[in-house]
């Protein structure tokens, strides 16, 4: 047995359909395209989303609203979370790097500090945005809310 005399197993391969090679081939004439109509012509392709004349899905479903390209999304972090982080790492100043190291945000996200929970230690908090209640709670303990 050599590479030169290997053959596929009996019945494992089929001969290719050679379309449009005369009536004797069995696939001549209309060449499997039927008679007339757009689908029989060269260059035909139906439009994307075309459903045979039925109203297509993208026109049946109502269209509401849009995505504002100028929207700024913030990751919300509450005061109770900041308090736990400060206690765990014994911090007096909490900033973006601390949030990234703790896994609260990724490096390209913006942070908004919200006022849920309470602070018991004096902290300087750096973030991109603060709610009014968060600023009030931070300053009530003697800390600073630094907007980046």
UniProtKB/Swiss-Prot annotation:
**For the region Disordered, what residue ranges are annotated?**
1-51
Cite the record's Gly residues compositional bias ranges: 21-31
Q: Which domain of life is it from?
A: Bacteria
**PROSITE patterns per record:** RIBOSOMAL_L15
Q: Organism source for this protein?
A: Phocaeicola vulgatus (strain ATCC 8482 / DSM 1447 / JCM 5826 / CCUG 4940 / NBRC 14291 / NCTC 11154) (Bacteroides vulgatus)
Q: Any idea which UniProt keywords this protein has?
A: Ribonucleoprotein, Ribosomal protein, RNA-binding, rRNA-binding
Q: What is this protein called?
A: Large ribosomal subunit protein uL15
List, alphabetically, the InterPro entries matched: Ribosomal_uL15, Ribosomal_uL15/eL18, Ribosomal_uL15/eL18_sf, Ribosomal_uL15_bac-type, Ribosomal_uL15_CS
The entry sums up its family as follows: Belongs to the universal ribosomal protein uL15 family.
Q: Name one GO molecular function term.
A: rRNA binding
Q: Which GO terms describe its cellular component?
A: cytosolic large ribosomal subunit
Example of a GO biological process term: translation
**Is Translocase a UniProt keyword of this protein?**
no
**What HAMAP family does the record tag this protein with?**
Ribosomal_uL15
Q: What does this protein do?
A: Binds to the 23S rRNA.
**Alphabetized Pfam families for the sequence:** Ribosomal_L27A (PF00828)
Cystine crosslinks = none
- Record note on quaternary structure: Part of the 50S ribosomal subunit.
